[in-house]
Amino acid sequence: MKKWTIDAAHSEIGFSVKHMMISKVKGSFTSFDATVEANEEDLNGALIDFKIDVASINTNNTDRDNHLRSADFFDAETYPEITFNANEITKKGDEYELTGDLTIKGITRPATFEVEYGGKGTNPWGVEVVAFSAEGKVNRKDFGLTWNQALETGGVMVGEDIKISLELEANPA
């Protein structure tokens, strides 16, 4: 197994959630770190852990971002990090299934991500690069993110399911 560190300049952790039951709000976290331990051919047996700085949330709307940082949602002052610690990764056809423990607001729940291994290459400066994409879905209420507003149409302002996406490039540690 080889250790890799995330190249933050070429990586992104994003999310999307239904808004008013008719559209989606997308955002990302601009400050995060991840470590990967993997063999060089594929992700079999890999360990992938990541840590996100909650205060770095960015939906391109300052008022919304501040609300998301508040105690109504992530309570970034009390719970400054979101973490994921891998338990297992298994090959499923051409992709992988990554399972582990996701902690948001001090609440830890199992989470599963579908992972696509992009492969390995060498950049123009001679540095090895591996890349992969991952997608998962969690129910925000499972992590104490319960704020919402009822709509006159009978729906709610914020959907329960949050789709999480990772686009990661890593270099040897």
Show which residues each predicted segment covers.
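Low-complexity, acidic/polar, glycine-enriched regions of mature
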Residues: 1-173
